[in-house]
């Protein structure tokens, strides 16, 4: 019996060694040739991206849950069909191509189609990147699920420019991921620059931060691999690709005479950052800080900076961690009104950190013996590692606008709509009106244009230059009617203007006052 048992053990050992040798030859062949990839889950991506679009765009537009800043962008898309041009007559800190898309969709629900296509494309390139860096197809699918959940919640009712830029950002990262996976393949850096340029003309500041993240990741990887010369080539190739797109599109602003305004508007979020003279600082720290903890940023940054990973994943995780910290700092130091959708700016870096949390291993398509060893679920680790706080944060981000709109301030919205109808009745289509309000809803509802590019006193007025511009525009253009939200503080100059040039219209409103020019 012992002889037979020994022969069986030897035979089993021979079979195991034979399988391992086949696995090694298969891996060697894949490394020498074109590496086999996991098939893309097209159907899942189409459904998940559609669900994320429905939650973040369609529902907010239908039920009036769009953020004030996003409402201003939608107003811009509608108003551009009436008259004027972007940056000169309409204020915005996003890119030119984004406003072209807003214009084509006329600022209405058609924009949902644009976002769905963007999210589908982003999912394709994100899946390819995860598969290239980790070889874990199933984990890459779970990454997509987490990504679409975060898009639906962080992008609920606003920050659509960031979401539309994601496919171009993730396409550039997919090319970087291919290089990190196989350093002998350093092609495609011209396309990286071109893709980043397109993303820049959609959402400038997040694109700059993402480009810096990629540059830092490549720099660290090339230094560690003693490929500094390759890094120089990659930098110049990317810069050339960026220039090929940037200059032709940017030249449009030169032709129209809006180049200076475009630069000023783009840099506004940076120029108005403040630490010591920021009245919103503590509120920003509490709001964005707690939500950041809720979505797991602290644990992801900690693992990104200190957890042991492969060289290629470490390069990405360190760069993404630093990019995420800078993005959070910009949000906390901002003087713009609070809104949960502004956290969508962290999506690019946050997604990269989630990707690097996938434990790298051999793909289940290569070795049967290694199929027995399965890494834990990315989705499960993400939730359990953060004590299920991401679910709490997602629910909070989705229901806070609903509670504000329909429970906390229903009267405010009802009176705003009623007064918009009254304004429409008492003015002609050529008349201009102004909303001294915390939301620019009046213009679309009354089908009237604003007399200034700064359509409310609470958006883009953190700088003295913009405050002066708003006041001068009101004095020079003198809107036919001015709607005043009594909860929004009136500037002294505006009070003087109202008392001298306007008379109060008698209404039943308790929260608004309506003024008409004398």
What are these regions (language model features)?
Residues 62-76, 87-101, 257, 411-416:
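Extracytoplasmic catalytic/substrate-binding loops of multi-pass membrane glycan-assembly enzymes
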Residues 112-135, 171, 175:
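Transmembrane-helix motifs of polytopic, lipid-linked glycan transferases
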Residues 408-464, 470-493:
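Short periplasmic/luminal acceptor-recognition loop of GT-C membrane glycosyltransferases, typified by
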């Amino acid at each position: 019996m012992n002889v037979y048992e020994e022969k069986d053990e030897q035979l089993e050992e021979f079979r195991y060694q034979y399988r391992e040798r086949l696995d090694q030859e298969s891996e060697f062949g894949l490394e020498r040739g074109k590496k086999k990839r996991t098939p893309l889950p097209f159907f899942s991506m189409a459904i998940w991206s559609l669900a994320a679009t429905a939650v973040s765009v369609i529902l907010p537009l239908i039920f009036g849950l769009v953020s004030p800043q996003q409402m201003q962008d939608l107003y811009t898309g509608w108003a551009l069909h009436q008259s004027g041009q972007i940056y000169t007559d309409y204020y915005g800190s996003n890119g030119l191509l984004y406003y072209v898309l807003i214009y084509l969709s006329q600022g209405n629900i058609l924009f949902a189609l644009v976002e769905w296509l963007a999210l589908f494309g982003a999912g394709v390139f994100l899946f390819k990147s995860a598969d290239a860096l980790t070889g874990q197809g199933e984990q890459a699918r779970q990454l997509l699920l987490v990504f679409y959940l975060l898009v639906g919640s962080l992008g609920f009712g606003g920050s659509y420019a960031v979401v539309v830029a994601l496919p171009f950002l993730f396409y550039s990262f997919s090319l970087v991921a291919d290089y990190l996976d196989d350093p002998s393949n350093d092609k495609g850096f011209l396309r990286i620059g071109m893709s980043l340029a397109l993303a820049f003309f959609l959402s400038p500041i997040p694109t700059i931060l993402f480009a810096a993240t990629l540059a830092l990741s490549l720099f660290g990887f090339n230094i560690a691999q003693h490929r500094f010369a390759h890094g120089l080539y990659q930098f110049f190739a990317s810069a050339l690709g960026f220039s090929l797109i940037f200059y032709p599109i940017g030249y449009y602003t030169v032709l129209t005479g809006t180049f200076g305004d475009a630069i000023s508007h783009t840099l506004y979020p940076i120029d108005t950052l403040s630490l010591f003279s920021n009245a919103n600082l503590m509120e920003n720290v509490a709001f964005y800080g707690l939500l950041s903890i809720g979505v797991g940023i602290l644990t992801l940054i900690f693992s990104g900076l200190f957890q042991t990973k492969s060289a290629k994943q470490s390069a990405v995780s360190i760069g993404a961690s630093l990019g995420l910290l800078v993005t959070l700092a910009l949000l906390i130091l901002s003087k713009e009104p609070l809104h949960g959708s502004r956290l969508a700016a962290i999506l690019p870096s946050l997604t990269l950190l989630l990707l690097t949390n996938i434990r790298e291993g051999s793909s289940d398509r290569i070795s049967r013996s290694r199929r027995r060893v399965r890494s834990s679920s990315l989705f499960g680790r993400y939730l359990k590692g953060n004590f299920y706080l991401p679910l709490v944060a997602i629910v909070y981000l989705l229901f806070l606008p609903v509670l504000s709109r329909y429970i906390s301030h229903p009267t405010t919205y009802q009176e705003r709509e009623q007064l918009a109808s009254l304004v429409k009745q008492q003015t002609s289509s050529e008349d201009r009106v102004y909303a001294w309000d915390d939301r620019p809803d009046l213009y679309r509802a009354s089908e009237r244009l604003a007399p200034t590019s700064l359509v409310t006193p609470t958006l883009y007025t953190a700088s003295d230059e913009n405050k002066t511009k708003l006041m001068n525009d009101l004095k020079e253009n003198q809107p036919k009617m001015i709607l005043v939200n009594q909860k929004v503080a009136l500037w002294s100059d505006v009070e003087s203007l109202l008392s001298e040039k306007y008379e109060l219209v008698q209404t039943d409103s308790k929260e608004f006052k309506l003024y008409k020019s004398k």
